[in-house]
Amino acid sequence: MTGIYYILYCAAADAYVYEERPDCWQYTGQDTALRFSALREAKKTRKKLENDGFPPLTIFKMKQTNTVIKKT
């Protein structure tokens, strides 16, 4: 599969995102993300992070958008 894949790091929770939570799943300027151009790379890094003690992580495939998301 081609595309851009991310493993997100949520600044609010100070942890890698391993489930979709309303305040963390979408990439914002306050969060950082590990970006991969290939799914294989993302899976390799996910496995390393999980082996280092993180819970099961989610790999997100994201598309570029100009939609502004506001926190309430």
List the model feature ranges, each with a label:
Residues 2-30:
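Short aromatic-glycine-(Arg/Gly/Cys) micro-motifs in beta-strand/loop hairpins
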Residues 25-41:
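Acidic, low-complexity, intrinsically disordered interaction modules
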Residues 37-72:
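Short, mixed-charge low-complexity intrinsically disordered segments
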